From Swiss-Prot:
It comes from the Viruses. This is Protein MGF 110-5L. It comes from African swine fever virus (isolate Portugal/Lis 57/1957). InterPro entries: ASFV_fam_110. Induction: Expressed in the early phase of the viral replicative cycle. Belongs to the asfivirus MGF 110 family. The lineage of its organism: Viruses, Varidnaviria, Bamfordvirae, Nucleocytoviricota, Pokkesviricetes.
Amino acid sequence: MLVIFLGILGLLANQVSSQLVGQLHSTENPSENELEYWCTYMECCQFCWDCQNGLCVHKLGNTTILENEYVHPCIVSRWLNKCMYDLGQGIDHVMVCSQPKHWNPYKILKKEWKENNSQNI
């Protein structure tokens, strides 16, 4: 019985270590080690992009988009396994941190940049 309990406890410990833990006070600039989590589930947040000269490159991948209203200031926070994105103006998304869900209210505004679009900039 003790062996089964310890085995289950070990499995739970492995799952917890791969999740974000602890409290995160409201911030527009989460730490580098948290960017993968926050930018995976809402990629339109401004802290997920490096924007220069009208183009934005996603910090976690090779996606390049035209700079527009798609890139939006976000405030993120975490408290008791609740993760929250706040886009201002009453637009927010709350999810269980260990069961995240993609959310992107600005998806329609995303305009990927391609080489043949370069004359449009």
